[in-house]
From Swiss-Prot:
It catalyses: L-rhamnopyranose = L-rhamnulose; L-lyxopyranose = L-xylulose. This is L-rhamnose isomerase. L-rhamnose binds at H95, E226, S227, K228, H262, D326. Optimum pH is 7.6.
Amino acid sequence: MTTQLEQAWELAKQRFAAVGIDVEEALRQLDRLPVSMHCWQGDDVSGFENPEGSLTGGIQATGNYPGKARNASELRADLEQAMRLIPGPKRLNLHAIYLESDTPVSRDQIKPEHFKNWVEWAKANQLGLDFNPSCFSHPLSADGFTLSHADDSIRQFWIDHCKASRRVSAYFGEQLGTPSVMNIWIPDGMKDITVDRLAPRQRLLAALDEVISEKLNPAHHIDAVESKLFGIGAESYTVGSNEFYMGYATSRQTALCLDAGHFHPTEVISDKISAAMLYVPQLLLHVSRPVRWDSDHVVLLDDETQAIASEIVRHDLFDRVHIGLDFFDASINRIAAWVIGTRNMKKALLRALLEPTAELRKLEAAGDYTARLALLEEQKSLPWQAVWEMYCQRHDTPAGSEWLESVRAYEKEILSRRG
């Protein structure tokens, strides 16, 4: 341990103790909050089903930084490199298109065996896995509809894909001893003025009911549904709106997914967490950074990321909120993108754990809003960085920007050799 780091840590302990915070307890609590890293940052959402195919569904990965993963082995190696630079508990979030098979597999026929390598890798790296059906980048989603499709056979294909995905998810949970959160997001919508907004939603409602009809062990699998305001090519109407999925999750008691980029730019999901928690059993969060639209920029340690973390901690939602990330930037080093975004999420959680929430609640209840604002602002200047650096030290990860040196070395030795 460096003398400088140790001295900063001791001073930080004293400073936080003065406001009633036990920093050791904060670090213990931080180790209770895994962050689920998304595999698709590593290859720009290409997957292994048809890596040369185009990305559809109203989403875009922009940029052409060299060295993206071309197969599962490369993606896992890149993930390992990123995870070595991120302290504390982690999970991995997979999409169905990241299956491994020597022969083509129709999406409605995916099975646990197509993901056994991921499970073995997760066991070796002490990770939980989460899952997603992939209802995009496919000939049967080309017209913009999947689970709400008017064609019975096409709709059934996507229903069967989601049902098969649930079994894969349950397999993850059973094998790894931690439930897999499986999130359903569909791109269904229309570009222009829509006359019949009801019928597609009726079809989606019935389709989802069929998807979740098979009872699975909640210790292995958790269903989640995700809304969106609009996508490219679906600007005027989205079948799976916020109101639709809030109603669905409430009435069916599934988890609700809130994506930071899936709402109007003036809305924030941090304000939605406490409201949703009154009605749904669990929340899945997709922490992202929308720049003017759902652009999925790398997560920053900004006001909204901090507000999301604070909501989780202030209301003791550790066991009801699942923290996932969802961004994909192809314009920068993809491993660095993972490291920056995931470390920022964990920093936000630590800062929330170092807040004297009980004292702030008392001030708020007493109507002393002056003191509340004053203390909230003074809190920002307390030496949380020293606590973060100690946390990194204890988890054998770089405390500061030294991690970038490791990324650069990996880029030179590994990424630069990829075609």
